[in-house]
Amino acid sequence: MTTGFLQKIFGSRNQRLVKQYQKTVAAINALEPQIEKLTDDQLRGKTDEFRQRIAAGESLDKLLPEAFAVCREASRRVLKMRHFDVQLIGGMVLHYGKIAEMRTGEGKTLVATLPVYLNALAGRGVHVVTVNDYLAQRDAEWMARLYNFLGLSVGINLSGMEHDQKQQAYAADITYGTNNEFGFDYLRDNMVYETDARVQRALNFAVVDEVDSILIDEARTPLIISGQAEDHTELYVRMNALPPLLERQIGEEKADGTGVEKPGDYTLDEKSRQVFLTESGHEKAERLLAEWGLIGEGESLYAPQNITLMHHVYAALRAHTLFHKDQHYVVQNGEVVIVDEFTGRLMAGRRWSDGLHQAVEAKEHVKIQSENQTLASITFQNYFRMYAKLAGMTGTADTEAYEFNEIYGLETVVIPTNRPPKRIDKQDQIYKTAKERYDAVIRDIRECYERGQPVLVGTTSIENSELLSHLLTQAGLPHEVLNAKQHEREAAIVAEAGRPKRITIATNMAGRGTDIVLGGNAEKQAAFLEADDSIPPDEKARRIKQLHDEWETLHEQVKAAGGLHIIGTERHESRRIDNQLRGRAGRQGDPGSSRFYLSLDDPLLRIFAGDRVRSIMDRLKMPEGEAIEAGIVTRSIESAQRKVEARNFDIRKQLLEYDDVSNDQRKVIYQQRNELLEAHDITETISAMRHGVITEVVHQFVPAGSIEEQWDVPELEEVLRNDWQLDLAIQEMVNESSSITAEEILEAVTSAADEQYEAKVAMVGRESFSAFERSVMLQTVDRLWREHLAALDHLRQGIHLRGYAQKNPKQEYKREAFELFAAMLDAIKQEVTRIVMNVQVQSPEQLEEAAEQIEEQGGHLENVEFQHADYAESGAPVANVAVAAAATADMVGSAMTHGGAGGEMPKVGRNDPCPCGSGKKYKQCHGKLS
């Protein structure tokens, strides 16, 4: 109450910020008359002047009014568009590292030019991030005219570009690209073997378009670079036969044994998207698997040797019960392609993790792609937090303002519209069944069609859009369908969705980023005419004028009919997605309207609010086909949406807390890697490693401060000879001296190791040996980091079970992840020392060849894929991540000869028998983490 009273007096934080920025707007406007008088060359010359002033120490904040005034004037001359005052405010919000919420049609693309121009003057690079390649290319080509006029270079970073093209794109003052591509480039840069193979510069300033889509909707979906792992194709096919033989249990058993309406083999929790086998389901699955020869007679699925099978059983069950064709995925060209649940777009190249994608492929009888091992991964949350300054813009951010602030430290500022909005948002209409709802939607569309009003219908899935399309065809209403299957045509369809009598069905926010102009998009048609050289100039000018005249007539006609009418056929889990759909109407003060038609069969209502609304309808004795339209019901639905939003926020926050652990470790490894790449000589690093490892080996058999009776000298001699190529007569030293200490033995072994090392260096030269050491170290770091990522994935998969032991899973994860990381660092030291001490050197040429071979094997991994894999959608616990497969083979081995034996050192996998002949697995013997 007190807060509301103070806000009335002083205004909200948002109002105060906007008022503060309006003072700067006045200063920019005051500069306009003198800037207008400048010639094109003088205006362009301002860029060099600003750069000199920045070099002399002037801050960007102080330059802001002049730079914005110059950018606005350049835009007026080049693009024939002058920034409105509210757009200047939006530009300031972005420059100060905040999120600007601007309504659809308010010119976000143009707003971005102001802070991008100002920050590019510093010469440290600016990244403009969009959601897809089409928007990146469109915006870059459109705005490059302005930036080039002002003397700035523009690059476009697209997937599939050549390495040299990418380096040029990043070297430009301003780089446009997609969130995926920027993230993958960061990961790839940390897998290279030469400094000049990197493409990115330091992460300076990023402006993220559709910031809610990238930083919130996709925050649960890490970017993963993966390589091929073990093949379980046959097992997925066998397991696919299991789910159809199991029946779903209806109802949940309570403590008193009641609650089960119909017994079955598994339960389905739609709210948390989980599936669980019941007791009878386990028994039935075990019996069937035994019949198929996959487990022994009477064996349990929980037996250690059957844990992998358990994983496949659940993957198959989830594929059959939780993931549906044309809703969660489509089958295209013999491949299962994920449909993004937020945008309805096809996510080509993205795969579900944890074996789920392979299980869906088996279900759809298409070719099963091999499982992958994670080579590198990062979430958008952690990638974008690395930028020195981050800003974003969207039409709908205010509902998620708390999350932006909590996770990214970004404040959201709602920018006033240039003209007052005229859109009318009508009350939701709720029907008992989906059939009644669709009948009402068709009636509404027909009424709009008859009065010449364009309609945009939003659906939540491809399945629903195709059903509605079928109903419209039956009703004889011409329409366009815009879903993930027509990805290429979406911009063209959206551009014309504002023409009279036009009916467009869109899956969620497909076509986002393209304005719907009332009367159609005359500019696009005029651009086609301009580009056609076969038309004479006079004829071209006449046709373009005719186009604009026709558009004026159509524009007024549509405005008179009520503007664009938005129909939502379902409420989304997030209010923000609903607001995005509504926001397509009423751009720049145009008239418009919106209404949502719901049914009690909708997932959101069924799961969260169905019983309450159904009881209201029953009490009111609503006849069939009659809708309930009341504020209390709409509020009940919004309350359900808030619950889902809060749950999704908790999921993202929890994922971030887990990912922060691996992120801290990633930073350490990548920093070490970069130091290695940039160092000319790593002799000191190798020397410190060698001394550390030798000390550990000696102390294992001759403990520090111990007496002679506790020593195992013969075993020490054997280990030094076999593993480290050091042939020392330590037993003789002990026999000859009555007072020798453990420290003296350590000193003797260390000296021998140093002498052996120096002899190798002397044979080939410091430079050649240093290059070899760098290659070995980089390859070892990369290989063990990959194994470590796999170990972390395994750890995270089961860590939630620690809660049953009254332990905090997050704390347990942090503790064990740290122990694994420390063990990995030890393993790096051991492995590098072992290779360097075992290598037999004959000539510098041979050493260079070995180094090149190591780099080639490490840098050119086979079957590398770039995935944007959705962990959270796999239906696994929140703590779960993709299970990476077994460790890769030792790639260093084939690049050098083994000391003593003179032949090739064998490749040893972690699960292979140890070459020392102990009979143990390599990972439990000489490959063991110490």
Curated annotation (Swiss-Prot):
The gene is secA. Its cofactor is Zn(2+). It catalyses: ATP + H2O + cellular proteinSide 1 = ADP + phosphate + cellular proteinSide 2. It comes from the Bacteria. It comes from Burkholderia vietnamiensis (strain G4 / LMG 22486). Zn(2+) binds at residues 914, 916, 925-926. ATP binds at residues 87, 105-109, 515. It is a peripheral membrane protein. InterPro entries: Helicase_ATP-bd, Helicase_C-like, P-loop_NTPase, SEC_C_motif, SecA, SecA_CS, SecA_DEAD, SecA_motor_DEAD. One of its GO terms (molecular function) is metal ion binding. Its main location: membrane. GO terms for biological process: intracellular protein transmembrane transport; protein import; protein targeting; protein transport by the Sec complex. May bind 1 zinc ion per subunit. It is found in: Cell inner membrane; Cytoplasm. Keywords: ATP-binding, Cell inner membrane, Cell membrane, Cytoplasm, Membrane, Metal-binding, Nucleotide-binding, Protein transport, Translocase, Translocation, Transport, Zinc. The keyword Flavoprotein does not apply. Belongs to the SecA family. Pfam families: P-loop_SecA (PF21090), SEC-C (PF02810), SecA_DEAD (PF07517), SecA_PP_bind (PF01043), SecA_SW (PF07516). PANTHER family: CHLOROPLAST PROTEIN-TRANSPORTING ATPASE, SECA INNER MEMBRANE COMPONENT OF SEC PROTEIN SECRETION SYSTEM. Monomer and homodimer. Part of the essential Sec protein translocation apparatus which comprises SecA, SecYEG and auxiliary proteins SecDF-YajC and YidC. This is Protein translocase subunit SecA. Its EC number is 7.4.2.8. Part of the Sec protein translocase complex. Interacts with the SecYEG preprotein conducting channel. Has a central role in coupling the hydrolysis of ATP to the transfer of proteins into and across the cell membrane, serving both as a receptor for the preprotein-SecB complex and as an ATP-driven molecular motor driving the stepwise translocation of polypeptide chains across the membrane. One of its GO terms (cellular component) is cell envelope Sec protein transport complex.
